[in-house]
Amino acid sequence: MFAWYKDLGRVDYKECWDLQCSLFDALIERKMSHRTESPTDGEESIGTVLLVEHPAVYTLGKNGKESNLLLGEEYLRSIGADFYRIDRGGDVTFHGEGQIVGYPIIDIEQLGIGLRDYIDALEQSIIDTVAYYGIEAGRLPGASGVWLGSAEEQNLRKICAIGVRASRFVTMHGFALNVSTDLRYFNHINPCGFTDKGVDFGIWEALSQPGIDMLIDLPHTESQL
């Protein structure tokens, strides 16, 4: 069992979204056709994992509230940021330079897990990866993503947003990990719908030779999925 991996570098959001949709539809079609055909010899992939860095863009999930977008679309575009309403779960978030975005388009049924376990695995992959670089992070009950700080000390900051779409156990969209992201872009939104929690990055300062390329392999993802 394996998945194809593609590091796309810096790619426009809409171009990458179109690629995701194409891979997503093709994987569902292949899956459904196999249910009516005889089993084939040989190992097939469970899908494709895309890693990418986007130019500045805001996205709003299908159940998100437009009130969490604090400034109008025209203003966002005036500062060089695009805006899209998309079909993932979650609310509004930002993607931009200094952020690793991962899109696993995979058949999680072949992994023997459901959507909740899949999201848990994504979160744990990020937790383990940032721990490798000396950053202690964790989950927040009742909220997706990966967080720094603690509720007790009232200093929770999200370093990784997660939002997915799934159909017939095939996934798309995924995670966005802040490495050296310009956090000022988050001032224009209530990130992921929260008004009382911030965003952060810590990995950049933890690296002896800073650079987003050092994290692209995400060394703990394979062990979780």
Where does each model-flagged region fall?
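N-terminal lobe of the biotin/lipoate ligase/transferase fold
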Residues: 1-156, 184, 215
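Histidine/acidic-rich helix-loop-helix segments that form or flank divalent-metal centers
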Residues: 159-162
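Active-site donor-binding loop signature of nucleotide-sugar glycosyltransferases
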Residues: 164, 181, 204
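Conserved phosphate/anionic-ligand binding catalytic regions in large, soluble enzymes, centered on
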Residues: 168-179
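C-terminal accessory segment of soluble enzyme catalytic cores
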Residues: 184-225
